[in-house]
Amino acid sequence: HICVFSIKKLMKSKENLVFLGMMGSGKSSIGSLIAKRLKLNFIDIDKEIEKELGTSIKEIFKTKGENYFRKFEEKITLKRLKLNSVVISLGGGAFTNKNIRKEVLRDNLSFWLNWDEDILLNRIKNSKKRPIAFNATVTLAEPSIKLPGFPV
């Protein structure tokens, strides 16, 4: 069970509740459930990008490339992080962006959803919606985010 009182109390000194984690970690599912329990709006950054560009993330990667996607992801994410009292689910690679990372850590309550790599692989292996799941240059056993002070 989610301790809504504890999260609300923690959020009083913070702007938003932000969920981080690798692809398939449950950021969108958990974020949506917690937003409902807290009676707050939920923002899924991947869905926001698809809505703004009118196409799927898979198609964006295919037609415009990852660099285009990452720049647009940064723009949308930084804009949404300026809102107050919302629950936000970031894209799986968003936290590798130094501007997004800085803003998330500045005035937001954030949770990193961490799972065993076998669980993550099982969650994403049959998904057609994950454009870089198996084209990545790193493996799930070797985290793509290696930052001092942020164990992954």
Regions inferred by a protein language model and the residue ranges of each:
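ATP-binding Walker
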Residues: S25
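Hydrophobic anchor at the beta1->P-loop junction of P-loop NTPases
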Residues: F19
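P-loop (Walker A) phosphate-binding loop of NTP-binding proteins
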Residues: M22
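ATP-dependent small-molecule kinase phosphotransfer cores
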Residues: N41, I45-L105, R130
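A glycine- and Lys/Arg-enriched "phosphate-lid" helix/loop adjacent to the NTP-binding pocket
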Residues: D107-G149
